[in-house]
């Protein structure tokens, strides 16, 4: 079986990290990148140096010419095309395209990549109409006739595996989620205009900012049994990466907190190994920086009021963990062909 050939549209936080994951994977080959807003030499700089995840150390990265990057001796074609219909993915050999601009998140817009020769598109964001898949939760529902999918959000990727384990073992009656979420690129460095979200316009590095999130409701799309049973909100906090989900649920089958811990630990060592983690050490957010798992349950941080009402805490590197799942979803789609 040959390598999985991927292209990336949008070389932002997720685009660059998906590239890092792909370039460190033996079964995946990055063949093309498109970004109309940055030059190839600047793309080299942005990829090589990363404030959060450190310098790229796995191969030399050089500029062959204005349309080609070299990772060691591996060429990657670079495009700078605004209209996704015009990106010649087929010529570059890209069969799977990661749509990571944050702009083309619905099916019709993402389908533009198919016109350029891509076979499948993975949207690295929630989508209002593309089917959403969370690896470890519902990727087995994917069928090869589906060409455009969403990898959901980083928060849904953290919450859904945890919710699945709890629901499968104890039954979730209802629940509320809060994500304490690191800063993202859409926030403001200083107070600025944000007509649709007034609080979101305040300085990211100086404030704890309440915000909305569809992550909890989206769990109902990947786990239909939980549709209408979960909702949530977000606090944006002044850290650059790593976030944490606080899930408070009422469960149907009475269980002690120890019982719940055992169920999560078993899942993390069994069917959800590599997706779900389990820790009992006294850790803080930076301890999870660079963790490739979607959801790392913090056994010491949770509490139970009684056998039916419990608060569960799970960490996630919202950049690196999510980027790994994008590539994992592509792997699954490739195997399903």
From Swiss-Prot:
Family annotation (PROSITE patterns): GAPDH
Chain spans, region Binding to NAD: 1-151
Pathway assignment: Carbohydrate degradation; glycolysis; pyruvate from D-glyceraldehyde 3-phosphate: step 1/5
Localisation: Cytoplasm
Keywords: Cytoplasm, Glycolysis, NAD, Oxidoreductase
Binding site for NAD(+): 13-14, 35, 82, 318
Described function: Key enzyme in glycolysis that catalyzes the first step of the pathway by converting D-glyceraldehyde 3-phosphate (G3P) into 3-phospho-D-glyceroyl phosphate. Essential for the maintenance of cellular ATP levels and carbohydrate metabolism.
Note: Plants contain two types of GAPDH: cytosolic forms which participate in glycolysis and chloroplast forms which participate in photosynthesis. All the forms are encoded by distinct genes.
Name of the protein in question: Glyceraldehyde-3-phosphate dehydrogenase 1, cytosolic
Organism: Zea mays
């Amino acid at each position: 079986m040959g390598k999985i050939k991927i292209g990336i549209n949008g070389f932002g936080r997720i685009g660059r990290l998906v590239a890092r994951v792909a370039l460190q994977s033996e079964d995946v080959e990055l063949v093309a990148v498109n970004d109309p807003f940055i030059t190839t030499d600047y793309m080299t700089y942005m990829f090589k140096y990363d404030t959060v995840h450190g310098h790229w150390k796995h191969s030399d990265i050089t500029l062959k010419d204005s349309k080609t990057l070299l990772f060691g001796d591996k060429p990657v074609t670079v495009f700078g095309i605004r209209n996704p219909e015009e990106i010649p993915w087929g010529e570059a050999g890209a069969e799977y395209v990661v749509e990571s601009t944050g702009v083309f998140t619905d099916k019709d817009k993402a389908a533009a990549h198919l016109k350029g020769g891509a076979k499948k598109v993975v949207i690295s964001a929630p989508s209002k109409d593309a089917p959403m898949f969370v690896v470890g939760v519902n990727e087995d529902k994917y069928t090869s006739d589906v060409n455009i999918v969403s990898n959901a959000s980083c928060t849904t990727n953290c919450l859904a595996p945890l919710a699945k384990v709890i629901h499968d073992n104890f039954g979730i009656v209802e629940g509320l989620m809060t994500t304490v979420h690191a800063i993202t690129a859409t926030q403001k460095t200083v107070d600025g205009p944000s007509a649709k979200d007034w609080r979101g316009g305040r300085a990211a590095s100086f404030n704890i900012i309440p915000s909305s999130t569809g992550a909890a409701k989206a769990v109902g799309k990947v786990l239909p049994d939980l549709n209408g049973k979960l909702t949530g909100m977000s606090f944006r906090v002044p850290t650059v990466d790593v976030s944490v989900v606080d899930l408070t649920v009422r469960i149907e089958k009475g269980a002690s907190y120890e019982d719940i811990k055992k169920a999560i630990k078993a899942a993390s060592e069994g069917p959800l190994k590599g997706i779900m983690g389990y820790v009992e050490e006294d850790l803080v957010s930076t301890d999870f920086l660079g963790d490739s798992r979607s959801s790392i349950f913090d056994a010491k941080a949770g509490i139970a009021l009684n056998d039916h009402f419990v608060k569960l805490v799970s960490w996630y590197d919202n950049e690196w963990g999510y980027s790994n799942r994008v590539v994992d979803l592509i792997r699954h789609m490739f195997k399903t062909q």
